[in-house]
Structure formats: structure tokens, C-alpha cells
């Protein structure tokens, strides 16, 4: 079943990124059929049987699970589209037993989840994981990312790529740097304090 196998990608972009792979995997695993209703939302087609993921926390989504009722579908939650109503443009999605009805407006918070980024997979586990590695993602070829992807698998892991690329990831122990204004601001503040201390020392010596 598609919910037991998860493709994990280092990035969204490129031929082996989530965007392109989701198009290809939807076409291969859940092609158009007269028995499957579908709804087009801008350039994305949501079809009965599609694997989808919530991309933002939404505390107002109502769901039912057996006789239980609740609310809230959260960033990273993965579900299967059970039905599409073309007339009302509502989509019914099963999030591991929690069944929610999405209006067409709510579809902007969904994306296909045949392939997701390794980052999005953190905290989740799957029976089988497939990780495609290409030279396009050379700036993401580091060990921690590979480790995160591999440890999502409970039973089987398949890494697709050349031995050289896999070895590059295993050997590269650096961590991704998060570039922001924090570092330069800290450097400015430290330089300012150093200047003040120097001025104080000069004043005292005078």
C-alpha cells in the first residue's frame, strides 16, 4: 500500500525533488480513471486515492474517527483522499482514521505526499523508505540528512544514487548553517562592547 512506502527527498526542486517526483508518482500509482473523481486546484489535480499532506497547522478542521469527533489537522499530517465531490467541490480525506472534509478553499494547505522532503519526515516512521540522491542536491549532501532519512524506515531502506554520491554524504559530517541576521548582529554587538571596553581603559589610564 502507498501509505506503507514513503519516498524521501533532500529537496523539493530538481528531477529528483518532491515536486517532480509527485507528478510522476501520481501518474504511475494513481492515474486518471473513470472510477476516480478528481478536482483541479490551480495547476494541481487532487484525485480519489491520492496521498496528500497538510502543509500548515489548521486547528479548525473538523474530523470524525469512529464515534469520536475532534478538530485540528497539523503540518506534516499525511492522509489518503477517499472521495471527491465535483458538485460541492469537497474532498474527503482519511488521516490515519481521522476523516475530514476539505472545501476547495482548504486545498491550498495540501500537497501531494508520494514524495516528501526529509525535513518534513522528521518525527515520522514508515515501513519502507526510498531516498533518491542526485548531483543536483550536492549542497545538501551531508551525513545528518542521510541519517535522518534512513532512520525513518522501520523495515526497509532503499537509497538510489551512485556509490560516489552516497559516500560523499557519509563522509560529509558538516551541519547545514542557518543564515540569518543573528550572526552579523552578534558580531556588531561584540565589536561595540570591545570598543567600549577599550575606551574605558583609556579613560582610566588618563
Regions found by a protein language model. Name each.
Residues 42-45, 69-72, 80, 116-117:
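Short, conserved secondary-structure segments in the cores of folded domains
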Residues 75-206:
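C-terminal accessory regions
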Amino acid at each position: 500500500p502507498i501509505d506503507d512506502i514513503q519516498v524521501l527527498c533532500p529537496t523539493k526542486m530538481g528531477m529528483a525533488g518532491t515536486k517532480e517526483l509527485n507528478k510522476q508518482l501520481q501518474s504511475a500509482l494513481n492515474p486518471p480513471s473513470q472510477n476516480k473523481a478528481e478536482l483541479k486546484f490551480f495547476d494541481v489535480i487532487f484525485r480519489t486515492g491520492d496521498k496528500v499532506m497538510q502543509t500548515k497547522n489548521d486547528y479548525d478542521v473538523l474530523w470524525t474517527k469512529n464515534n469520536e469527533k475532534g478538530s485540528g489537522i497539523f503540518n506534516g499530517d499525511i492522509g489518503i483522499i477517499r472521495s471527491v465531490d465535483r458538485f460541492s467541490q469537497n474532498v474527503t480525506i482519511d488521516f490515519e482514521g481521522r476523516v475530514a472534509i476539505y472545501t476547495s478553499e482548504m486545498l491550498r494547505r495540501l500537497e501531494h505526499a508520494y514524495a516528501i522532503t526529509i525535513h518534513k519526515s522528521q518525527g515520522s516512521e514508515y515501513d519502507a523508505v526510498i531516498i533518491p540522491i542526485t548531483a543536483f542536491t550536492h549542497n545538501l549532501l551531508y551525513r545528518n540528512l542521510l541519517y535522518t532519512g534512513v532512520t525513518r524506515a522501520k523495515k526497509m531502506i532503499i537509497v538510489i544514487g551512485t556509490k560516489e554520491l552516497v559516500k560523499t554524504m557519509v563522509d560529509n559530517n558538516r551541519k547545514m548553517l542557518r543564515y540569518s541576521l543573528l550572526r552579523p548582529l552578534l558580531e556588531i554587538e561584540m565589536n561595540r562592547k570591545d570598543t567600549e571596553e577599550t575606551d574605558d581603559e583609556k579613560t582610566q589610564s588618563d
